[in-house]
Amino acid sequence: EIVLTQSPAITAASLGQKVTITCSASSSVSSLHWYQQKSGTSPKPWIYEISKLASGVPARFSGSGSGTSYSLTINTMEAEDAAIYYCQQWTYPLITFGAGTKLELKR
């Protein structure tokens, strides 16, 4: 089973700040996806196939990486970006998720 380790577990950012969340895989994966979850809702697909933004995701988000190291970046933090972000990979026959990164708005 491939284990995904996210860093940091929790972070806070001010409006306009650049935010980077990392996801490290215990062995190489061919693709990686990101989900966003807000309180009381189900996780939403956010970035798929490493760097492709899901429909409706603002262009301030980007994804990158390869092999065992991946990241999600928010170029300029907005209040609506406060959420939990999860990375996810699928290597037959198992889908695995990271434990999540909680991103809070620093006021």
Curated annotation (Swiss-Prot):
Region (Framework-2): 34-48
Keyword Chaperone: no
Coiled coil: none
Disulfide-bonded cysteines: 23-87
Ranges for region Framework-4: 97-106
Region entry Complementarity-determining-3, spans: 88-96
InterPro entries attached to this UniProt entry: Ig-like_dom (IPR007110), Ig-like_dom_sf (IPR036179), Ig-like_fold (IPR013783), Ig_sub (IPR003599), Ig_V-set (IPR013106), IgV_Light_Chain (IPR050150)
Keywords: Adaptive immunity, Disulfide bond, Immunity, Immunoglobulin
PROSITE patterns per the UniProt record, alphabetical: IG_LIKE
Complementarity-determining-2, as annotated region: 49-55
Superkingdom per UniProt: Eukaryota
Region (Framework-3): 56-87
Pfam family, one: V-set
Positions of region (Framework-1): 1-23
GO biological process, one term: immune response
Region of interest (Complementarity-determining-1), ranges: 24-33
One cellular component (GO) term of this entry: immunoglobulin complex
Misc. remarks from the entry: This chain was isolated from a myeloma protein that bind galactan.
Protein name according to UniProt: Ig kappa chain V-VI region J539
